[in-house]
Swiss-Prot record:
GO terms for biological process: isopentenyl diphosphate biosynthetic process, methylerythritol 4-phosphate pathway; terpenoid biosynthetic process. The keyword Lyase applies. Pathway: Isoprenoid biosynthesis; isopentenyl diphosphate biosynthesis via DXP pathway; isopentenyl diphosphate from 1-deoxy-D-xylulose 5-phosphate: step 4/6. Pfam families: YgbB. 4-CDP-2-C-methyl-D-erythritol 2-phosphate binds at residues 8-10, 36-37, 58-60, 63-67, 102-108, 134-137, 141, 144. It is an enzyme of class 4 (lyase). The record marks 36, 135 as: Transition state stabilizer. A divalent metal cation binds at residues 8, 10, 44. The gene is ispF. GO terms for molecular function: 2-C-methyl-D-erythritol 2,4-cyclodiphosphate synthase activity; metal ion binding. This is 2-C-methyl-D-erythritol 2,4-cyclodiphosphate synthase. Homotrimer.
Amino acid sequence: MRIGHGFDVHKFGENGSGPLIIGGVRIPYEKGLLAHSDGDVALHAATDALLGAAALGDIGKLFPDTDPAFKGADSRALLREAYRRILAKGYRLGNLDITIIAQAPKMAPHIPQMRVHLAEDLQCHMDDINVKATTTEQLGFTGRGEGIACEAVALLIKVEQA
């Protein structure tokens, strides 16, 4: 078994800068996150956790923000490509736990769909995926509504060869 940790943060743009995409879900909100890709902090943290567990570097190494090919990239596609590499290395997901840190908008109504997307992309059961959200009680940049942060922990299991 191998454990990986991922972290990501993105700053909000101005009003009308949307869309806001978290966990592969488009969330109604007046601001989007500024990023080279679609800015999905949950999927970026999850991808980093998975890559870290497999010792495959990080999302910035695999999909550099200096490469125009990844401008506006769908983070679900990046996650699927990272997981393809993990499978090729002989590992599969054991479980994934994600914590979204945001003062607003409320994430709870969107978490079930986030779990569905993650289970689809990682070819696993929804019971292997946990997503939760918290605030920082109006402290720090997330508490002031300047951006969203996310942490993820992934467990990979070595696939037995027949």
